[in-house]
């Protein structure tokens, strides 16, 4: 009889659809990607162009813990402001854990919850201490998604008062003491019910379209899969010059590199990021323009090497930069030094002789003047 009642309860849950969690990510039907960025870039011909396309949500982290990336847990709080406690949790691999010994065999979760989307909690016999707000929490660690649903449980002594109603925010269950209670939590989104091969649903591709060509007729350049598979398309003159890092899915960096850029490479490049499992569809657009190559002036020949007929001689570092500076170079030849010294001594000697001549002439004139004055004085006395 007890087993039959449990089966009837679970069948009732499958028919209920009033309390269904809705996932925050779009479904797989939304395969069209949305443009998240559009920019115009220019690179000189002959250089390497890098079109940046990065997304941390596309980082591939393989599940090495046997599908422990999805988990459901139920919490209980007495009301606003009260500290909640964990009741039970279960991973998508089937591992279930009840935290309190008194709740073992009293709290039940369906083992097929991650297959049919039924995460409802069954309390076999309600007690007074079971009153409070129950929260159903779904966590998808791989896709970084979190969903929650609250249900309030009230316990009554009169079985005739048992009922269920909506208070405007959450479902409220009024259950008789000792009777079973079913906290409904249903989410049938594929994220919670299926375990797809994520690496097969993660793909990045680069497209190229010439000016005037619509987006839906763009040429495919590259296809990248999280499994490691890569496919190259496009014209031969461009196929061998484009590349993406081999560890792109490990770093979330899918930037496109174009070597030896040519004018024919101009166009519109699009980076498409698709994570079908998590519902991610993004597109980044780049308008690439190729400019004239930058020519560097030829290197000048070093002074004195005599190389090159058209080479311009380097300026003499000893030349004066301005008119107020005079550079004097004294050779190291001793003969030339003594010759210059002789010129200086001869000039000095001539200057001394000239000075002596001037002194003698001055004295002679002074003595002649004195004699003339004496003669005039003698005549005046006589």
UniProtKB/Swiss-Prot annotation:
InterPro entries: Ig-like_dom, Ig-like_dom_sf, Ig-like_fold, Ig_sub, Ig_V-set, MXRA8
Membrane topology category: Single-pass type I membrane protein
Site (Cleavage): 324-325
GO cellular component terms attached to this protein's record: bicellular tight junction; cell surface; ciliary membrane; cytoplasm; nucleus
Matching PROSITE patterns: IG_LIKE
Location of Phosphoserine modifications: 227
Residues covered by region (Disordered): 297-317
Short motif (RGD 1): ranges: 128-130
Compartmental location: Cell membrane; Cell junction, Tight junction; Cytoplasm; Cell projection, Cilium membrane
Organism superkingdom: Eukaryota
Residues in the Extracellular compartment per record: 20-340
Segments crossing the lipid bilayer: 341-361
Protein name in UniProt: Matrix remodeling-associated protein 8
Gene name of this polypeptide: Mxra8
